[in-house]
């Protein structure tokens, strides 16, 4: 069998003859290795503490954030069955439209600390700290051969970039599944790199487990990094080809088992004794995987929750993400979320590979570039060309890859600064970052108008200093230029990320940036919009093509019952719902008592009146009420602390049937029916079944007005 020398990245794992003894594990944790500069490990801890402070500070400002997922977490604190399935309500009528892994973490936090805004979002913020640490650890290992200082500085830069990405600052303080998704994918990257020095089966199996649970977080999106991880292990693992193949097989089995156990459990569970699988057309998880959360996202199409609806001012099929194409990630919709350092990352990838040249395929630095580059290219291309519904906040999944490339490629170019390609590469990264930062900051010209000029001028002067440093007598200018250029290059993205953390984000479509700004076209930038805007499906009085998904979907117009138009879906994109023709659409709702509600019905400004709250809270029925649509039901659940039946779920699911609803009413399981207007009106529930239920209720029960809402008491027929 072919043998390999112990790589630099793993030499500390074995005692070297004559080498000084290693510090105890606790000392290494806080001080690093003996040969590390004294400031390196404290710098890491400073970065992690700073990330924790920024992401935890005023965490409750957003209330319950996305009420759709918040209601599911509340349900999980009351019912272990709801916890397991990811039910929207504690009486287990229907699930959310995603697998429940992210809910499990938040439910456990809420069970320990009590259900509140802080306990809901605490795990999300801590996942940011974990992601920063994992990116640091991954980059440091791939750069170890460059020397401990260069490796650690590159790793610190990568970790900082993750924390300073606006999309990360948004989603790691929000209750959507994306925070856990990013953490798990990053854990998979770290495990893959740990597996390389000796072709470890244990570490590559852990990578498979991480991606398996990423699948249970957001299904197929969690597997977009799989090609990069597989190629890196196959090419760079320091073991025989046979053992590499076996290792990949073990990883595949680990992935399937860790992802499939829940799918199998749901499939084997009698359908009549579990909640309906939200987002599916046939009450199965597989339909959710390959339809609503699968091909529907890629190819679009109506009748599928992943499909796009009307796009208003945008291009058909773009649904909040802008038109498809290579420039989508740089468009106003997505650019402010993720693209601040994207040009620099692409430069780092190309020139980094040039710098490593023809080294052995197992070279750790090359492996790092391939891992992060494969992650960025595959995921970025899918996001750029998918025709189904996509939202700008999805791009948070690119943050670790961009950070990894900037840290790895930047360190390689710095190490090669005595060569022309190293100096020109560093200058190019800084110059393009400064120029693109100016463009992005210019999207909000009234916000800190001086900042974009500081970024541009400072960055270009720094790049010029690096070029001037090519003169032998001015080599110190390279160091000064790199340090200053890094500072100016990170200023724009850091400022925008910090501004994002100071703004309340509630409802279904959060957005990055300072108060009053929005990254989506529907919030004021050109070329944007999603369904529900004038000229698109879901305008006033209409419905969004009969389907909306909890992550995206399109909007519905208001029905006659006074419901506001819904935003996008629970995974949506902008911090404030675009104002609709009837004037509704504030994203930051409060209840009558002034408490944050996590975004009113549909992410709009509607709230539950105290009269309706008291009425439903006093009900002892299995479901205090039934209402069309998951977002309407979610807000009622949060306000009344009761289980509410969401007719039609989020995307016009065929549940319940009229016969099932009538049977539950006859059994006294549903206390009230709260009207959402003609044909549904609330998010989801716009199906013919929902209309039939509403017509049947109106024909057999007396309508009363409670707090401005039409309510039917289902305990007394007319």
Predicted regions and their residues:
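Hydrophobic alpha-helix feature that most strongly marks membrane-spanning transmembrane helices
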Residues: 335, 355, 386, 402, ...
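Transmembrane-lumen/periplasm boundary regions of multi-pass, lipid-linked membrane glycan transferases
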Residues: 28, 66-70, 75-79, 226-354, ...
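Alpha-helical scaffolding within the catalytic cores
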Residues: 273, 281, 655-664
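Helix N-cap/beta->alpha junction signal
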Residues: 165, 491, 629-630
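Transmembrane helical bundles and short interhelical boundary loops of multi-pass, membrane-embedded
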Residues: 417-518
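Membrane-integral, polyisoprenol-dependent glycosyltransferases
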Residues: 1-287, 291-301, 313-425, 432-436, ...
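Structural recognition of the beta-strand scaffold that forms the well-ordered cores
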Residues: 124, 181-183, 223, 288, ...
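Aromatic/acidic, Gly/Pro-rich catalytic loop(s) in extracytoplasmic/lumenal soluble domains
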Residues: 504, 585-589, 599-605, 610-624, ...
């Amino acid at each position: 069998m072919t043998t390999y020398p112990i790589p630099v990245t793993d030499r500390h794992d074995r005692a070297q003859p004559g080498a000084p003894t290693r510090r105890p594990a606790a000392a290494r944790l806080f001080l690093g290795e003996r040969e590390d500069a004294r400031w390196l490990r404290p710098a890491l801890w400073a970065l992690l503490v700073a990330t924790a402070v920024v992401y935890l500070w005023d965490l409750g400002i957003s209330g319950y954030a996305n009420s759709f997922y918040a209601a599911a977490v509340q349900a999980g604190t009351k019912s272990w069955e709801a916890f397991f399935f990811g039910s929207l309500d504690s009486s287990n009528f229907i699930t959310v439209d995603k697998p429940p892994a992210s809910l499990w973490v938040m439910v456990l936090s809420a069970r320990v600390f009590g259900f509140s805004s802080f306990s809901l979002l605490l795990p999300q913020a801590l996942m940011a700290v974990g992601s920063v640490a994992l990116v640091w650890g991954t980059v440091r290992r791939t750069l170890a051969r460059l020397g401990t200082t260069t490796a650690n500085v590159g790793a610190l830069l990568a970790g900082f970039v993750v924390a300073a990405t606006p999309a990360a600052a948004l989603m790691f303080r929000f209750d959507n599944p994306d925070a856990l998704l990013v953490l798990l994918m990053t854990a998979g990257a770290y495990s893959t790199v740990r597996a390389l020095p000796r072709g470890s089966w244990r570490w590559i199996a852990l990578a498979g487990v991480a991606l398996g649970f990423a699948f249970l977080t957001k299904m197929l999106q969690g597997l977009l990094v799989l090609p990069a991880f597989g190629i890196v292990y196959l090419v760079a693992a320091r073991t025989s080809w046979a053992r590499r193949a076996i290792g990949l097989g073990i990883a595949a089995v680990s992935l399937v088992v860790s992802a499939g156990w829940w799918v199998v459990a749901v499939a084997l569970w009698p359908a009549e004794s579990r909640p309906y699988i939200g987002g599916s057309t046939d009450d199965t998880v597989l339909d959710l995987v390959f339809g609503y959360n699968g091909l529907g996202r890629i190819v679009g199409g109506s009748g599928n929750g992943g499909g796009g609806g009307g796009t208003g001012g945008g291009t058909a099929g773009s649904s909040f993400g802008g038109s498809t194409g290579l420039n989508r990630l740089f468009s106003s919709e997505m650019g402010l979320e993720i693209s601040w350092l994207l040009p620099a990352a692409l430069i780092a990838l190309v020139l980094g590979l040039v710098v490593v040249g023809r080294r052995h395929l197992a070279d750790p630095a090359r492996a790092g570039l391939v891992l992060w580059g494969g992650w960025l290219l595959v995921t970025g291309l899918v996001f750029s060309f998918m025709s189904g519904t996509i939202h700008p906040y999805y791009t948070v999944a690119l943050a670790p890859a961009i950070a990894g490339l900037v840290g790895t490629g930047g360190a390689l170019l710095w190490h090669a600064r005595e060569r022309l390609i190293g100096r020109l590469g560093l200058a190019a990264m800084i110059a393009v970052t400064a120029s693109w930062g100016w463009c992005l900051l210019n999207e909000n010209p009234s916000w800190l108008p001086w900042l974009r000029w500081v970024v541009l001028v400072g960055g270009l002067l720094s790049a010029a200093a690096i070029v001037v440093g090519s003169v032998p007598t001015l080599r110190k200018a390279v160091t000064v230029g790199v340090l200053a250029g890094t500072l100016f290059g990170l200023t724009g993205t850091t400022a925008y990320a910090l501004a994002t953390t100071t703004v309340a984000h509630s409802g279904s479509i959060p957005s990055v940036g300072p108060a009053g700004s929005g990254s989506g076209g529907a919030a004021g930038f050109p070329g944007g919009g999603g369904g529900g805007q004038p000229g698109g499906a879901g305008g006033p009085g209409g419905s969004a093509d009969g389907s909306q998904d909890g992550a995206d979907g399109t909007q519905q117009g208001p029905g006659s019952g006074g419901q506001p138009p819904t935003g996008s879906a629970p995974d949506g994109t902008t911090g404030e719902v675009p104002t609709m023709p009837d004037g509704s659409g504030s994203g930051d709702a409060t209840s009558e008592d002034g408490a944050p509600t996590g975004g009113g019905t549909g992410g709009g400004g509607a709230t539950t009146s105290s009269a309706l709250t008291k009425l439903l809270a006093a009900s002892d029925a299995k479901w205090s009420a039934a209402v069309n649509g998951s977002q309407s039901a979610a807000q009622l659940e949060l306000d009344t602390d009761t289980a509410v039946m969401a007719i039609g779920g989020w995307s016009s699911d065929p549940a319940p049937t009229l016969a099932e609803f009538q049977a539950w009413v006859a059994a006294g399981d549903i206390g009230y029916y709260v009207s959402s207007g003609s044909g549904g009106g609330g998010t989801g529930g716009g199906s013919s079944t929902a209309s039939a239920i509403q017509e049947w209720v109106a024909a057999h029960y007396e309508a009363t007005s409670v707090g401005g809402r039409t309510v039917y008491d289902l305990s007394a027929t007319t």
